[in-house]
Amino acid sequence: MNTLNAPRNPTRHPAMTADTLVDAPALPHQNGSTEEKLKERGSFGKLYTYKRSPRALGIQAVAKSIGLELEQVELQPANGVPDFYWNLNPLGKTPTFVGADGLVLTECMAIALHVTNEDSTTTLLGSSSLDFVQIIRWISFTNTDVVTRMASWVRPLIGYTPYSKEEVLKAQQQTTQAIGVFEDSLRDRKYLVGDRLTLADIMCVSLVSFGFAQIFDKEWREAFPYFSGWYMMVMHLPIMKAVVEEVPFVEEGLPNAPPTEPFRAP
C-alpha cells in the first residue's frame, strides 16, 4: 500500500449497499455567516455542461452544498457548439465555468477546486497539505487514466466510435487494471483521503458514474466489492443526492457486440 495513503480509523465494509447506509454523514459543515455572504452576492456564475455529465456532477454537488448559485447552461459538444463557445473553451469541450466576475475556467478539477474554495470553512480539501495533494492525485488519476479507459470500453458499444471486439476487450482489461488501484486502497479505509469525505470522493464517484450506468454490472461489481461499496456509500450521501435524482446503477452491462442503434447524445 502507498504509505501516503495509510489508513486512519478504517471503517469500510465491502458489502455496503444503499439499504445499510444508516450512518451517512450530513453535508460538510457550513458557517452561517458564509451562507449569508454567498446569498447576498447572488449568481456565482454559469457552468456549461450537459445533464448528468460525470465531469460536472461533483462540481454541482459542492456548489449546492455551500449555497452557491451556479447556473447550468445546457451544452452537448456531441451535437455541436455555438461559435462564441470556442472563445471560452478552444477545444469545444465541457464543462466550462464563466464566473459572474468574468473569470473563465476549463477542466473539471480546476473548476471544482475554485468552487470548493469559496467556502472558507470547508473540510472537503483535507486537513493538511498532504491531504490536499492526495486529493489532487485521486481526481487527476480518475479524470485521466480511469475515465479514458472506461470511455474506450463504452464508446464503441454505443456507436460513438467504430466497434472492434478486440479493442473493447483491451479497454475492458485496462479499466479493470485501473479500478484495481481503487480496490486496493479502499480495502481498509472508508474514504479515499483521510478519515472523512473530501473532494476526491465527490469528484471520483461522479467521474466513474457512467461506468456504473452502462458497464459495471452485478458480476463486475462482485469482483470489486470495496470500490463498488464506496461508490454506493458516497452516492447516497446528502451532498450527492441533492444533485443526483437516481444513482446510476446497471444490473446487466452493455455486451461486447456492435451497437444495435445509432449513437444518440444524452
From Swiss-Prot:
Record-annotated GST N-terminal domain positions: 43-123
Up-regulation conditions: Expression is positively regulated by the cluster-specific transcription factor pbcR.
Molecular function GO terms recorded: transferase activity
Cellular-component GO terms for this entry: cytoplasm; nucleus
Domain GST C-terminal: 128-259
Gene3D superfamilies the record matches: 1.20.1050.10, Glutaredoxin (3.40.30.10)
One example of a Gene Ontology biological process annotation: terpenoid biosynthetic process
UniProt cross-references to PANTHER family, sorted A to Z: ELONGATION FACTOR 1-GAMMA
Protein name listed in UniProt: Glutathione S-transferase AN1595
Organism annotation: Emericella nidulans (strain FGSC A4 / ATCC 38163 / CBS 112.46 / NRRL 194 / M139) (Aspergillus nidulans)
